[in-house]
Amino acid sequence: MTEQNTQSGFVFNLEKIYIKDSSFEVPGAPQVFLDTTNPEVGVQLGISHNQVNAEQGLYEVVLAVTVTAKHADKAVFLAEAHQAGLFRIGGMPEADLPKVLEIACPNVLLPFVREAVNELVGKGG
């Protein structure tokens, strides 16, 4: 995941990708597995970012996903994953930085957090 434009000096590198936090809860297990009706599922996304090292142009971006499933106001499961990436970004106008941190970086992280949530839900029952 490296994109460099040597003529303009633009740098966009994914240096490291990692799970910062994950959790899975099935508060009503094992009784909840006996219910065959489909639960109501909700998905929430959140993005956060912070500068790790200004001289090196390093930024941590975290894409947080929370999936809740409920049936008759009772929680079936709660899955949460915070997928993080360490990005090296530089050589661009300061005004463009928020777009990169809030659009381009989460776009890179999305397939990884989707896989993490899929594994949590799949292994959780």
Predicted regions and their residues:
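N-terminal intrinsically disordered, cationic/polar leader segments
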Residues: M1-G125
